[in-house]
Amino acid sequence: KAGYRHIDTAQVYRNEEGVGFALTKALEDQGLSREDVFITTKVFPGNEARGQSPMTYSDTLNSIEPSLEKLQLDYVDLYLIHAPFCKNERVEQWRALVEIKRLGKAKSIGVSNYNQIHIEEIKSAGLPLPEANQIELHPWCQKTELVSYLNQNDISIIAFSSLVPLSTWRSKEGEKSSKSEQMKADGEDPSSIFKVLSNKYRVSEA
């Protein structure tokens, strides 16, 4: 109703079931089809630094099923590896996503929080490169070298926390920007600073 068509969630957010319920109801109430929305979710790879076992190829391959069940979908539009935490399993985790796409359970596949080194691992393994990389990106965190690398390799960039310093989670004392009012100039104006930056750096928002 408000015009939102891209829903971004993740297994670790623990809200896929709620998203699935709301999505099913919204599509029915608004007379929309599945193709009218774009659904992204993410598999958490494990984090050995926090005592979590890394996801194996098999674990990762099977990880899509509970997400689809909770989301009440046959496929997601984009499936991401949430972070590059598991050095020894990263390539196999990516190999599993390639298979998930081949099986038709994800239209596109990608990664999140990856840098050049992590993507070069995939390239060295001879596997298809990610179609997208979701990274923190905003005027205070520009990552110019990574953005250039992703563009050179035709990897779409999806920005998260793109409203910093306007977002509330970065509103501690000393973190607010003196340019906040200037940066609120968005909306339909094609000269909006947000639109200009998005077009300049070929970045979309999560």
What does each model-identified segment do?
Residues K25-E35, L71-L73, I100-K105, A125-L129:
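Short helix-capping segments at alpha-helix termini
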Residues S33-E48, L78-L80, P84:
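A short, structured active-site edge motif that brings together acidic residues
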Residues D59-L80, E99-L103, S124, I155:
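CE4/NodB-like, metal-dependent polysaccharide N-deacetylase domain
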Residues A83-A206:
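Beta/alpha (TIM)-barrel catalytic core signal, keyed to glycine-rich beta->alpha loops juxtaposed to Asp/Glu
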Residues A10-G18, G46-Y57, F85-E89, L137-Q142, ...:
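Acidic-and-aromatic substrate-binding clefts and catalytic sites of carbohydrate-active enzymes
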Residues R5, D74-D77, K107, E131:
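Short acidic/polar active-site loop segments enriched in Thr and Asp
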Residues K1-V37, D74, L163-S167:
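N-terminal binding-site loop/beta-alpha segment at the start of enzyme catalytic domains
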Residues K1, S53-Q72, R90-E92, I117-E121, ...:
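Short, acidic/polar
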